[in-house]
Amino acid sequence: MLTLFSYFGFLFAALTLALVLFIGLNKIQLI
């Protein structure tokens, strides 16, 4: 159970980081 929770936590963190990088690149291109 704890392993499954850790896996989803890691996946959520990876998706969040990817989203932040994607938004950051878009802001750089808009400037």
UniProtKB/Swiss-Prot annotation:
The UniProt transmembrane annotation reads 4-24
GO cellular-component term (any): chloroplast thylakoid membrane
> What broad class describes the main subcellular location of this protein?
plastid
Which locations, inside or outside the cell, does it occupy? Answer: Plastid, Chloroplast thylakoid membrane
The record's keywords, sorted A to Z, are: Chloroplast, Electron transport, Membrane, Photosynthesis, Plastid, Thylakoid, Transmembrane, Transmembrane helix, Transport
Q: Name one GO biological process term.
A: photosynthesis
Instruction: Determine if Protein biosynthesis is one of this entry's keywords.
Output: no
Q: Which family does it belong to?
A: Belongs to the PetL family.
Function, as annotated, reads: Component of the cytochrome b6-f complex, which mediates electron transfer between photosystem II (PSII) and photosystem I (PSI), cyclic electron flow around PSI, and state transitions. PetL is important for photoautotrophic growth as well as for electron transfer efficiency and stability of the cytochrome b6-f complex.
Protein name in the entry: Cytochrome b6-f complex subunit 6
What is the species listed in this Swiss-Prot or TrEMBL entry? Anthoceros angustus (Hornwort)
Q: What is the lineage of its organism?
A: Eukaryota, Viridiplantae, Streptophyta, Embryophyta, Anthocerotophyta
